[in-house]
C-alpha cells in the first residue's frame, strides 16, 4: 500500500488534490481512500491530507503517521518538525520550491529522496494564479507513478470545464520539470 501525507496552508486547495488523486486511482481500478484534516492556531491555519492507494481493499481508516510520501505545498511549512515526522526510511518528500535538492538538504537536514518542482511558477505561468494543486499533482504522479498522468485529464475536464485544459497543462509541465534526487546515505 502506498500511503501519502500532504501539508498545505489553508486556502491552497489541497483538498482538491487529495480528492482528484483518490478518484484517479479508483478510475484505474485501484482501491483508494483520501481525506483531509484542518488544524488551526492563533497564528495560522494549515491542512493535512491523507491518501492511501492499494491493489487490495483498504481496511485502515486513520491518519497516516508513517507515510511513504510527504507532499509539501509551501516550503515554509518545512520549518515545522511535524511536517516530516514519521517519513519512512525509504520515503520520499515532494516540495514546491525553486531551490535545488542539495539546497533543501542543507537548509532542513533532509536525507530522504527529494522531488522538487517550482509549482508556484508553473501555476503563475500557465494558470495565471498561485493555485499549486495541479502542478503538485503532476509531481506526485511523476515520483510515484501511482496512476498514469492521463488519468487526471478527464477528471479535471469534468470538474472544471474548459479551464480543465489549463490545469492539465500545468500538471503536465510539473511532471516534466520535477527534479528527483535519491536519498542520501
Language-model region placement:
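Active-site cofactor/cluster-binding pocket
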Residues: 1-185
Amino acid at each position: 500500500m502506498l500511503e501519502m501525507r500532504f501539508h498545505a496552508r489553508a486556502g491552497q486547495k489541497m483538498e482538491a488534490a487529495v480528492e482528484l488523486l483518490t478518484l484517479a486511482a479508483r478510475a484505474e481500478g485501484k482501491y483508494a481512500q483520501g481525506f483531509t484534516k484542518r488544524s488551526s492556531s492563533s497564528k495560522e491555519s494549515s491542512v493535512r491530507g491523507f491518501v492511501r492507494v492499494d491493489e487490495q481493499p483498504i481496511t485502515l481508516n486513520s491518519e497516516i503517521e508513517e507515510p511513504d510520501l510527504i507532499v509539501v505545498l509551501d516550503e515554509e511549512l518545512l520549518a515545522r518538525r511535524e511536517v516530516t515526522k514519521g517519513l519512512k526510511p525509504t520515503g520520499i518528500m515532494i516540495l514546491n520550491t525553486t531551490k535545488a535538492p542539495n539546497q533543501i538538504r542543507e537548509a532542513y537536514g533532509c536525507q530522504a529522496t527529494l522531488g522538487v518542482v517550482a509549482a508556484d511558477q508553473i501555476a503563475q505561468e500557465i494558470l495565471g494564479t498561485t493555485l499549486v494543486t495541479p502542478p503538485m499533482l503532476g509531481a506526485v504522479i511523476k515520483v510515484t507513478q501511482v496512476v498514469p498522468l492521463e488519468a487526471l485529464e478527464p477528471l479535471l475536464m469534468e470538474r472544471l470545464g474548459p479551464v480543465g485544459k489549463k490545469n492539465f497543462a500545468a500538471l503536465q509541465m510539473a511532471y516534466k520539470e520535477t527534479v528527483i534526487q535519491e536519498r542520501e546515505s
